[in-house]
From Swiss-Prot:
Pfam families: Ribosomal_L33 (PF00471). It comes from the Eukaryota. Disulfide bonds: none annotated. GO terms for cellular component: chloroplast; ribonucleoprotein complex; ribosome. GO terms for molecular function: structural constituent of ribosome. It comes from Chlorokybus atmophyticus (Soil alga). PROSITE patterns: RIBOSOMAL_L33. GO terms for biological process: translation. This is Large ribosomal subunit protein bL33c. Coiled coil: none annotated. Keywords: Chloroplast, Plastid, Ribonucleoprotein, Ribosomal protein. It is found in: Plastid, Chloroplast.
Length: 64
């Protein structure tokens, strides 16, 4: 029998500061991958994480 998909999905978090900031250490955008539980957090995830491109802790938002 086939198993159901489950509640945990893999998501990508992207730095919001890298998109708008022109004065950064290196080109590109900082991204993290993590898992979230669909039932506990149905809306988009936002976490403060370290961005190696900006060299500081910034807000990372979930992207599709």
């Amino acid at each position: 029998m086939a198993k159901n998909k489950g509640t945990r999905i893999t998501i990508t978090l992207e730095c919001t500061n890298c998109k708008s900031n022109d004065l950064k250490r290196s080109p590109g955008v900082s991204r993290y991958t993590t898992q979230k539980n669909r039932r506990n957090t149905p809306n988009r995830l936002e976490l403060k994480k370290f961005c190696s491109r900006c060299n500081q802790h910034t807000l990372h938002k979930e992207i599709k």
